[in-house]
């Protein structure tokens, strides 16, 4: 039974802050552009300027159901937590891949190895996915924070909505009919272990545990063939929380189809099977034909008997009634037409949207070619980028460094540059590669005297190792952060850097999450003129931003300055005319386009920030951030005070106690959707266990 979406709910933004800096201007521009029907725009916001708050204000003022996309689960989890705080009275939902572990089905012909699909589903995330889709069909004040998994195939929203079991007090329906209806939408009867997606029966009382809940269920009480009343109950205690006048029970799976459609689908699957068997046999592929026939007939039998089978999504083209090559239904189809998309860190996220389709297709083609799947399985896939674009009604790309794709989509760019803390983008200068190490040693000593820290980023692992060894010989307290370092050790390194155990951190990629250190006042980028992933314009701007959390922030780009530019040389004259040069000690030297653009952008932002601070009497203050020991265990001494014990200094019994404590914290972090924290804690537990 279809349900009506409530459309008169309003977004209610709850915050103790008012827009600060240039947030107000950015919010006004974005809202005005949306109300004027602008399809695409970019919010180019410097790091630390409060872009999430701006996004929240835009959602509240436009009142549109909104999809916020992020490029990984960690970032999505952080955004979800922030939006939940801003909108406690609205539906803020979370939609990411529900697999804790996922090994996709695959076939490797070279070794004749078939890898069966193996996965572990996170029940909590599955619940949140169901909550997201049901909210989208019930109301309009919805924000869904999602990873790129939202462009993967999901069942038809029409079938999902049409399958809803709608119940009201006074409604004429027999108890047995309700039980049949619940089984039809993939609910399971379980009178003992009552959990999500189950129902239980006690005489004239049916209790239903929706797939989108984890604590509350509903008790439907019958009087003959009529519903007497419906009550919400707490599952654990059975306590009645109140009566409801309407209950919409959404299916326990997103892949739904009715009985008539199921028979049609099975007929199409059988026809496709017959056609594909003829192809295989005509090509002499008898093993592939036998394999396909056996597997598909088993699935058909399961579909007939149970309405479901393992890997049912591979038949989604037939289930949905789609034509070959037609895009699958996704989360985007559950939104009303007039919805808004916000892409966070768009320079990363849009790249993922582009790459998803090709990787998925290459794997599935192998399965189809060798008789593990019917060719229609190719249509169980993520959207292509152009298909994603066809769903866009209005979109806001959010990034400190928007990518080429976003810049091609729109000329409308709204800037947000002022940090509420008054902090400025750092001063950037170029120095010669010749003598760079001795120069850098001098700069490090200056910072060490002021109890400040230094980041040094190199291009190769060998250079990082050699540089670290040289610094140690020079008496500098230094450590090297490389990709092989485990979570526990990485956390210790960052903490030790902040505490001043050492002064310099050397690495190749210092852009990873969790390496923001307010004590860092100098970032040195070696080989800044070698174009590449971490030396392109965006990579340089992001690395330069590592010094933007300190009021003394300074960045040095070391570049090849072997030859000064000569105005009389035609080639040099061309470089001078292009502007891609820098001055050093009265001479002009060539720099790369990326260096020039990164330096110009940083200087432009800094000028705007300085002017704003001067006008409003703001003095930049280095961010004060508590230094915590993530691997310390606390225990009470005789005096009742807490003391910290280092994990490496513990005995086996103490380490066991620490593991127990960390496991509890890990579960709490996962429940709070702090997936990065939970993952770090998990890795710490594994490493502590390895000590024993």
Curated annotation (Swiss-Prot):
One of its GO terms (biological process) is nucleotide-excision repair. Keywords: ATP-binding, Cytoplasm, DNA damage, DNA excision, DNA repair, Excision nuclease, Helicase, Hydrolase, Nucleotide-binding, SOS response. Residues 32-187 form the Helicase ATP-binding domain. A motif (Beta-hairpin) lies at residues 98-121. It is found in: Cytoplasm. Residues 436-631 form the Helicase C-terminal domain. Its main location: cytoplasm. SMART domains: DEXDc, HELICc. Residues 656-691 form the UVR domain. InterPro entries: Helicase/UvrB_N, Helicase_ATP-bd, Helicase_C-like, P-loop_NTPase, UVR_dom, UVR_dom_sf, UvrB, UvrB_inter. Forms a heterotetramer with UvrA during the search for lesions. Interacts with UvrC in an incision complex. The beta-hairpin motif is involved in DNA binding. The UvrABC repair system catalyzes the recognition and processing of DNA lesions. A damage recognition complex composed of 2 UvrA and 2 UvrB subunits scans DNA for abnormalities. Upon binding of the UvrA(2)B(2) complex to a putative damaged site, the DNA wraps around one UvrB monomer. DNA wrap is dependent on ATP binding by UvrB and probably causes local melting of the DNA helix, facilitating insertion of UvrB beta-hairpin between the DNA strands. Then UvrB probes one DNA strand for the presence of a lesion. NCBIfam families: PRK05298.1, uvrb. This is UvrABC system protein B. The lineage of its organism: Bacteria, Bacillati, Bacillota, Bacilli, Lactobacillales.
């Amino acid at each position: 039974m279809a349900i009506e979406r409530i459309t008169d709910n309003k977004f209610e933004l709850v915050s103790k802050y008012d827009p600060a800096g240039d947030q107000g201007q950015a919010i006004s521009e974005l809202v005005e552009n949306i109300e004027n029907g602008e399809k695409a725009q970019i919010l180019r916001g410097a790091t630390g300027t409060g872009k999430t708050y701006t996004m929240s204000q835009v959602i509240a003022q436009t009142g549109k159901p909104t999809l916020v996309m992020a490029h990984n689960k960690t970032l999505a989890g952080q955004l979800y937590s922030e939006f939940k705080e801003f909108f406690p009275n609205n539906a803020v939902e979370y939609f990411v891949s529900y697999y804790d572990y996922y090994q996709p089905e695959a076939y490797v012909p070279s070794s004749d190895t078939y890898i069966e699909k193996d996965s572990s589903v996170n029940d909590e995330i599955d619940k949140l996915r169901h909550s997201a889709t049901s909210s989208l069909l019930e109301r309009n004040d919805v924000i869904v924070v999602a990873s790129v998994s939202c462009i993967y195939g999901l069942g038809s929203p029409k079938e999902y909505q049409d399958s809803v079991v709608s119940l009201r007090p006074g409604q004429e329906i027999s108890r047995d009919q309700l039980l049949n209806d619940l089984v039809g939408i993939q609910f399971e009867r379980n009178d003992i272990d009552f959990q999500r997606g189950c129902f239980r029966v006690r005489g004239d009382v049916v209790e239903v545990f929706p797939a989108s809940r984890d604590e509350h269920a509903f008790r439907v009480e019958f009087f003959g063939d009529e519903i007497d009343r419906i009550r919400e109950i707490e599952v654990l205690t059975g306590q009645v929380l109140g009566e409801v006048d309407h209950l919409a029970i959404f299916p326990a799976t997103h892949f739904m189809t009715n009985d008539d459609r199921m028979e049609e689908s099975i007929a199409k699957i059988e026809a496709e099977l017959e056609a594909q068997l003829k192809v295989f046999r005509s090509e002499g592929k008898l093993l592939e034909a036998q394999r396909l026939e056996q597997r598909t007939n088993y699935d058909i039998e399961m579909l007939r008997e149970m309405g479901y089978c393992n890997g049912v999504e591979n038949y989604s083209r037939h289930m949905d009634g789609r034509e070959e090559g037609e895009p699958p239904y996704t989360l985007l189809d559950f939104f009303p037409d007039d919805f808004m998309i916000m892409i966070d860190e768009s320079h990363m996220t849009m790249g993922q949207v582009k790459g998803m389709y090709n990787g998925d297709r290459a794997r599935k083609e192998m399965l189809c070619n060798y008789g593990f799947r019917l060719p229609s399985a190719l249509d169980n896939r993520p959207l292509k980028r152009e298909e994603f674009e066809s769903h866009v009604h209005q979109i806001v790309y959010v990034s400190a460094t928007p990518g080429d794709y976003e810049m091609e989509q729109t000329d409308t760019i709204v800037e947000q540059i002022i940090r509420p803390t008054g902090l400025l983008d750092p001063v950037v200068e170029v120095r010669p590669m010749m003598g760079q190490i001795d120069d850098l040693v001098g700069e490090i000593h200056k910072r060490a005297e002021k109890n400040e820290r230094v980041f040094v980023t190199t291009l190769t692992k060998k250079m990082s190792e050699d540089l670290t060894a040289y610094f140690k010989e020079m008496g500098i307290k230094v450590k090297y952060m490389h990709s092989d370092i485990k979570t526990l050790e990485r956390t210790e390194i960052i903490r030790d850097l902040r505490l001043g155990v050492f002064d310099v951190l050397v690495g190749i990629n210092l852009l990873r999450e969790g390496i923001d250190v307010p004590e860092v006042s100098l970032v040195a980028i070696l080989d800044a003129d070698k174009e590449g992933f971490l030396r392109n314009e965006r990579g340089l701007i992001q690395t330069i931003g590592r010094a933007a959390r300190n009021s003394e922030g300074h960045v040095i780009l070391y570049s090849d300055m072997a030859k000064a530019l000569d105005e009389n040389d035609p080639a040099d004259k061309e470089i001078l005319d292009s502007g891609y040069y820098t001055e050093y000690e009265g001479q002009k030297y060539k720099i790369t386009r990326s260096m020039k653009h990164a330096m110009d952008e940083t200087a432009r932002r800094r000028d705007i920030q300085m002017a704003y601070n001067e006008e409003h009497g703001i003095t930049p203050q280095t961010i004060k951030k508590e230094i915590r020991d993530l691997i310390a265990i606390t225990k009470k001494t005789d005096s009742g005070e807490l003391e910290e014990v280092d994990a490496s200094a513990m005995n086996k019994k103490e380490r066991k106690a620490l593991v127990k404590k960390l496991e509890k914290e890990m579960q709490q972090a996962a429940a709070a959707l702090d997936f990065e924290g939970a993952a770090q804690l998990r890795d710490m537990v594994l490493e502590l266990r390895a000590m024993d």
